[in-house]
Structures are given as structure tokens and as C-alpha cells.
Amino acid sequence: IFNRKPVPRVPVWMMRQAGRTDPEYCRLRKEDGRPLEEVFLDAEFSTKISLLPRRLGVDAIIMFQDILTPLAPMGAGFKFNPAPVLHEPIIKMEQVRSLKIPNPPKDLKTVGRILQGLNAELQGSLPVLGFAGAPMTLAFFMISGKSPSANIPEILDFMETHPSFTEALLERLTETTIDYLLYQIENGAHIVQLFDSFADKIPEPFYLRWVQPSHERILKSLERRAPGILFSRGCPYLDLLAATGADALSLGDGISISKVREKYPDFIIQGNIDNKILADGSPEMISNAIRTCLDETKGSNHILNLSHGLLERTPFE
């Protein structure tokens, strides 16, 4: 797909394909017994988890990690309980000034080992995907001190009323993300995806001022190194997404792929099956959703995926 060569069929992988929907994952985690923040530091175990979806016939393997992985070496440690909770929220300028830019070969070496291990196991049979959380998504977590889903309006207001704080935090996160993704590519990631998980909650003026510049810097830093996929969850600002330099756009289920294709015929599109249909729909509903999605792209420049990650309640079958 990214080499612009014909493929025999539309390739498919799923966000969060290695995780709690898989009984084998649940069994391994139960036997292991460690909290997630420790599991992510175990390269051998994380490699094993990453490879579980191979038996499903997916066309790519994404490494098993969390979008928050770079935060701990920055000085913003966290634990899973069961969702991630930071040791303390980052809400003061002196806290931002104390954040360090990690040195990936030293501070994130587990990720490098995972990617090397995946390539050693796969021997070129499947591409390996790396990823990172986008700076705004990471900033939301840091300011909230936990999952920000319930208080995004308050976070947006805080960031708008503290522009110097916001600029300094996003600058550190953008530098960290660029270094992190380039390190992943150096260690065997064939493609990388940037996850902005709350983009659908951000007003356009805020998005244009604070989100777009970091997306452009990060994705353009990847040029000629590896393809970059932008997942800006449910984001309606299509022209902004297209201007980032991304090689592919991962779209939510609320966006018509055919309309995107009309406007941007050469873009590689990833998506966009509603993850709730996969979790709650009948086999017929799932088949219909897949056919509709495939019909919209006619199988051209398309990676079949979901609107967001697999939901925990999704039946493994």
C-alpha cells in the first residue's frame, strides 16, 4: 500500500488488536500477575503479547505498549489502577520546566528491544507498526492526572487561560514524540501511527493553534524515513488533517470515506468500521458494515481498520 504497488486484497489490522478481547492475552496476564506498567518494561513478554493477533490473520503487527510510555522517563510517572493514574497532575510551570526530554536509547530501550524482537520473529512476513500518543493527548492526561475523558472542557479552559504553560508543555511533548518515533523507526518499525485520541472534543480555533502545529512537525520529521499514519479521533477538520504531511489518515466512523476520497483521491485511508458494531452487532451487521466500507474505497489505497480501538466487551469470535 505505502509503496503504491498493487495488493491482492485490502489489508486489515485493528487498533488494540493485542489486548483484553483476546482470552489468551487475559490468560497470560493472569498467570503473570504484574501490573501493566511493569509488563510494558518487559520486552520479551510484550513481544509475545504483540504477536498474539498473528493467529487471526491480520496483515500487520503493532507493538504492545501504551501511549503514555514516554511520560515516566520525562518525570511524569504513572501506574495503572486499572486505568492510568499519574503520580501527580502537571499543572504548574515549574513542573513543566522540570520535565526532561528522554534519550530513547537509554530511557525507552525496552521499546527498541520489542521492535527488534518482533522483526526477528516475523522475518519480514508482516510489517511492524510503532506508535506514539500525540502531544495534545498526552497533555490532557498530564493535566488531568488520569483519563481526561470526563473533564476535557475544563482542561481546554485551563490551557487557553495559561498559554505560556500550554506552549512549554506541548513543545517538550512534541520534541519527545519526534525523538521517540524516529527511535522506533531505527529499531525496526516499518510504519508509525500518531494517536490523537480526543481530537473530536477540540474546537477548531484551539485545534488550529495548538494541535495542528505539533502534528505537522512530527509527521514531517518522518519524511523519507517511514510512512506515518495520523489517527485524529473523529476529527472533522479534514483539510487540516490533509495538510499535516501524513501518508495515511485513519478516519472515524462519522466521516464518509467516499467523500474524503473525492476530495483527496491519492490519500491512503485507514478505517473506518464502527468499533461498537464489532462489539455489539450481529454477524450480519458486521458483514454489512465491512462491505459498505470496502465499497466506498473500491479496494484502492485502503487499510481496513476500526473507528477506534477494540472495545473490551468485543467477543473474540
Model-flagged regions — what are they?
Residues F2-Q17, V58-L86, K106-A150:
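Glycine-rich, aromatic-flanked loop segments that form ligand/cofactor-binding clefts
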Residues L28, A76-F80, M93-S98, I143-S149, ...:
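Surface-exposed, active-site-proximal loop segments in enzymatic domains
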Residues I1-F80, E216-R217, D295, F316:
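N-terminal basic, low-complexity leaders that serve as flexible interaction/assembly modules and, when applicable
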Residues D107-E317:
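Active-site loop segments of alpha/beta catalytic cores
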Residues I62-P82, L86-P104, G188-Y207, S307-G309, ...:
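Glycine-rich, proline-tolerant flexible connector loops at the mouths of alpha/beta enzymes
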Residues R27-V39, M93-P104, L241-A242:
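Short, basic, glycine/proline-bearing loop/turn elements
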Residues I1, P23-R27, P35, Q95, ...:
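Exposed alpha-helical structural elements
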